[in-house]
A protein has these predicted regions:
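SAM-dependent methyltransferases
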Residues: 1-14, 45, 270-272
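Active-site-adjacent loop and "lid" segments of alpha/beta metabolic enzymes
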Residues: 5, 29-38, 42-43, 62-84, ...
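Catalytic domains of carbohydrate-active enzymes, especially glycoside hydrolases
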Residues: 42-58, 249-250
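Phosphate/pyrophosphate-binding loops at sites that engage ATP/ADP/AMP, CoA/4′-phosphopantetheine
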Residues: 48-49, 90, 167-180
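Short, charge-patterned binding micro-sites
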Residues: 61-66, 314-341
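N-terminal beta1-alpha1 ligand-phosphate binding loop
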Residues: 271-311, 317-321
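Flexible, gly/pro- and Lys/Arg-enriched active-site loops
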Residues: 325-333, 350, 354-437
Length: 437
């Protein structure tokens, strides 16, 4: 998945780090540390040397309770810093909620507009429409001055996800390309500690929307409460751990104060893999309840997937019922796709999957024939192989409706490790037509 930011293009399947450069006197964790021009430039270049791909320049504090500053004051802090960094060949993001400031900084060379207000201002949308900068669309309930005044949600994950989906769709309707948009659920912005924690533990719901997504938890107050760390400067290690967790759930951009600590944590990021599950023989089912029996067997297999060492299920698709493919004289199938993070190598993973199939009575007599449970590796991150034991990506993914639909449900626009888009075969040309249950 690429994030297009003016002349910069980032493949965010492997997370990248955006270094935070606050040129303010009053930011919550580093206000005043880099608010002279020379200090700001030096710190930005240091973060680039440490491995940051983007520098996010902010000239207005958005900490809870902060007062708005004038655009003139904001630009006096930011625009020359943006200009010098951009001229040095650095990808610069401007962290602003003011259209006039965004326009001036884009003209000075900024390649990204990071708007904590989520492009609610029509003037900001017009700035975005008139340039080719990448956009960070954030969720914030209320305004910085009042956002922490008892925020209430019926379901914080659903409300934030749906808000971001709506804002992204509106931006696309305004003429902004899909691949310019990055979504940020806004941890700590109009959310208390427990709400933010719930949101971060369900980050895959944001990733499901099919856009690049950002985790911006660095030194946030919820980390202080969750880990018992009062001083924001002491939260870098915990922040990096939270960022790693979000990246395992699908985040592709990490906004961080401490670039070195963050990249150190991201070394532990496990590859993702997609598994396809299918069943059309129910071992135990009353007449008329065969579908429920098939679902029960797939659920049992998913339970066993949870037991594979150094692995974690990230997401599971809905169940789909599909027509038989290739060998037609058999019962309909129930299918699903599972997204996992795993430290287990593909060949070893295949052995675990065969053991799960065998435990559920899998008999391999007829090619593409009836089965109690089938668990296939569909795609394994950055891994392409074709030998007698294993072929990856699975060679028939794109022609199988019963794989394409559940996979795209959890990972819209997914591109396989060999560069093939999952949706490359039109639906009317696929086999095994599938319907969501």
């Amino acid at each position: 998945m690429n994030w297009q930011c003016a002349s910069y293009s980032f493949d965010v399947k492997m997370p990248i780090v955006m270094g935070i450069l606050n040129v303010t006197p009053d930011s919550f964790s580093d206000g005043g540390e880099h608010n002279t021009h020379d200090a700001a430039i030096a710190h930005a270049k240091s973060m680039i040397e440490q491995g940051a791909k983007i520098i996010d320049v902010g000239g207005e504090s958005t900490r809870p309770g902060s007062a708005e500053v004038s655009v003139a004051e904001e630009l006096s802090r930011t625009v020359e810093v943006v200009r010098e960094l951009a001229q040095a060949g650095i990808c610069v993001s401007i962290d602003t909620r003011h259209a006039e400031a965004a326009r001036a900084c884009v003209e000075a060379g900024a390649a990204i507009i990071n708007d904590v207000s989520g492009f609610r201002d029509p003037a900001m949308v017009e700035v975005a429409r008139s340039c080719d900068a990448g956009l960070v669309v954030m969720h914030m309930k209320g305004e910085p001055r009042t956002m922490q005044d008892d925020p209430v949600y019926d379901d914080v994950v659903v409300e934030v996800r749906d808000y971001l989906a709506k804002r992204a769709a509106e931006l696309e309707a305004a003429g902004i390309a899909h691949d310019r948009i990055c979504l940020d659920p806004g941890p700590g912005f109009g959310k208390n500690a427990s709400q933010t924690m719930e949101l971060m533990r369900n980050f895959h719901e944001i990733a499901r929307l099919g856009y690049p997504s950002m985790v911006a938890v660095s030194r946030k107050s919820y980390i202080g409460k969750a880990y018992g760390i009062e001083d924001p400067h002491d939260r870098d290690r915990a922040s990096a751990a939270e960022a790693l967790m979000a990246c395992e759930l699908g985040a592709g951009v990490v906004r961080a104060h401490n670039v070195e600590e963050t990249l150190k944590a991201l070394k532990d990021l496990r590859p993702y893999c997609y598994l396809g599950l299918g069943c059309n023989v129910a071992l135990v089912a009353e007449p008329g309840e065969e579908r429920e029996g098939k679902i029960a067997q797939i659920e049992h297999a998913i339970g066993q997937l949870c037991m594979i060492p150094d692995s974690q299920i990230v997401d599971v698709s809905s169940y789909y019922e599909s027509e038989p493919a290739y060998y037609l004289d058999q019962e309909p199938f129930v299918n699903a796709v599972v997204l996992m993070r795993t430290g287990v190598a593909p060949k070893e993973l295949l052995e675990y999957l065969h053991a799960i199939e065998n435990s559920l009575g899998r008999v391999r007599e007829i090619e593409n024939g009836p089965r109690t449970c089938d668990v296939d590796i569909l795609d394994y991150q950055l891994y392409v192989v074709d030998n007698d034991v294993l072929t990856l990506p699975h060679p028939r993914i794109c022609e199988r409706d019963f794989v394409v639909k559940p996979l795209l449900e959890i990972s819209p626009n997914h591109v396989l490790a060999d560069g093939t888009p999952v949706a490359s075969v039109p639906e009317d040309q696929r086999v095994g037509r599938a319907v969501k249950l």
